[in-house]
Amino acid sequence: MEQQQQQQQLRNLRDFLLVYNRMTELCFQRCVPSLHHRALDAEEEACLHSCAGKLIHSNHRLMAAYVQLMPALVQRRIADYEAASAVPGVAAEQPGVSPSGS
């Protein structure tokens, strides 16, 4: 059980780092047009702050929607699984009826 928790934590960390790296790359490409200076100028810094803030806000909204929809998705998957499991059982319970219908 502990190993599963560690694997889940590693997956969560990997997912976080992928999102972070993608956000960093996207904002850097948008906001830093040249690398002629060692330091960011005020305009670049403001752009990066705005870009990162927008992406973080969007990510929070997506996660909130995901958390809200997740119980319904799980219930639907359970119902689909139960329905799919019940279909082969019905044909097996009826003697003389083949599953292919012939």
From Swiss-Prot:
Q: What is a GO molecular function of this protein?
A: metal ion binding
Q: Which GO terms describe its biological process?
A: protein transport
- Report which residue ranges the record marks as coiled coil: none
For this UniProt record, give its keywords in alphabetical order, as a comma-separated list.
Answer: Disulfide bond, Membrane, Metal-binding, Mitochondrion, Mitochondrion inner membrane, Protein transport, Translocation, Transport, Zinc
Membrane topology (UniProt): Peripheral membrane protein
For this protein, the record's PANTHER family field holds: MITOCHONDRIAL IMPORT INNER MEMBRANE TRANSLOCASE SUBUNIT TIM9B (PTHR13172)
* Cystine pairings recorded for this chain: 27-51, 31-47
Listed under GO cellular component are:
mitochondrial intermembrane space protein transporter complex; TIM22 mitochondrial import inner membrane insertion complex
Q: Does the keyword NAD apply?
A: no
Instruction: Map motif Twin CX3C motif onto the chain.
Output: 27-51
Q: What does this protein do?
A: Component of the TIM22 complex, a complex that mediates the import and insertion of multi-pass transmembrane proteins into the mitochondrial inner membrane. The TIM22 complex forms a twin-pore translocase that uses the membrane potential as the external driving force. In the TIM22 complex, it may act as a docking point for the soluble 70 kDa complex that guides the target proteins in transit through the aqueous mitochondrial intermembrane space.
Principal cellular location given in the protein's record: mitochondrion
Task: Describe, as the record does, how this protein assembles with itself and its partners.
Answer: Component of the TIM22 complex, which core is composed of TIMM22, associated with TIMM10 (TIMM10A and/or TIMM10B), TIMM9, AGK and TIMM29.
Among SUPFAM superfamilies, the record links this protein to:
Tim10-like (SSF144122)
Q: Which organism is it from?
A: Pongo abelii
User: Per its UniProt entry, which superkingdom is the organism in?
Assistant: Eukaryota
This protein is called Mitochondrial import inner membrane translocase subunit Tim10 B
